[in-house]
């Protein structure tokens, strides 16, 4: 199954609280932190919520 490599590229300062909570739920704690998650609808939805703060790459 494919996986997603999610990298936080921008700071959450000034963002809404739900965006901060979503970043924390994804495991992102600061700029340039990366996590690898399974490619599932739950994670796709979280990434969509904070798409302006992160970059996403598909990893095999």
Curated annotation (Swiss-Prot):
InterPro entries: Ribo_uL30_ferredoxin-like_sf, Ribosomal_uL30_bac-type, Ribosomal_uL30_CS, Ribosomal_uL30_ferredoxin-like
A GO biological-process term: translation
Top-level lineage group: Bacteria
Protein name: Large ribosomal subunit protein uL30
GO molecular function, one term: structural constituent of ribosome
Family statement: Belongs to the universal ribosomal protein uL30 family.
Keyword set, alphabetical order: Ribonucleoprotein, Ribosomal protein
Pfam families: Ribosomal_L30
Cellular component GO terms, alphabetical: cytosolic large ribosomal subunit
Subunit: Part of the 50S ribosomal subunit.
Listed HAMAP family: Ribosomal_uL30_B
PANTHER family: LARGE RIBOSOMAL SUBUNIT PROTEIN UL30M (PTHR15892:SF2), MITOCHONDRIAL RIBOSOMAL PROTEIN L30 (PTHR15892)
């Amino acid at each position: 199954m494919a996986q997603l490599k999610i990298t936080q590229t921008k700071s959450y300062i000034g963002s809404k609280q739900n965006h901060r909570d979503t970043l924390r739920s994804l495991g992102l704690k600061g700029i340039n932190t990366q996590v690898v998650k399974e490619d599932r609808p739950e994670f796709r939805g979280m990434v969509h919520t904070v798409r302006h703060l992160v970059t996403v790459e598909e990893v095999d």
